[in-house]
């Protein structure tokens, strides 16, 4: 799936609900109802939901974070939050 400059390829499956939410966000972005920063923030919120629903830690690590190991989900969430901050900062610099 491609939204703005983001390529979403790291989640193998979406629930129907998440897919519907992503479609709504894409429509809002394409109709200028939301800006790129809002789109990015909302997409990352959905990503975090998807990650937290995943039960296979190694799959999460390999698909998203490229981390070698993880001790608990709090570390995972910290890493995701860091990457969100980095991504949003990069998007703001582009704008």
Where on the chain are the PLM-derived regions?
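Short acidic-hydrophobic surface loop/beta-edge motif
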Residues: 1-6
């Amino acid at each position: 799936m491609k939204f703005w400059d983001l390529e979403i390829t790291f989640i193998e499956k979406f629930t129907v609900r998440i897919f519907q939410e992503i479609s709504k966000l894409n429509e809002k972005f394409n109709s200028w109802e939301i800006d790129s920063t809002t789109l990015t923030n909302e997409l990352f919120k959905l990503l975090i939901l998807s990650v937290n629903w995943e039960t296979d830690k190694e799959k999460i690590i390999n698909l998203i974070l490229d981390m070698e190991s993880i001790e608990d989900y709090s570390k995972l969430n910290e890493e995701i939050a860091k990457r969100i901050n980095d991504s949003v900062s990069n998007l703001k610099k582009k704008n």
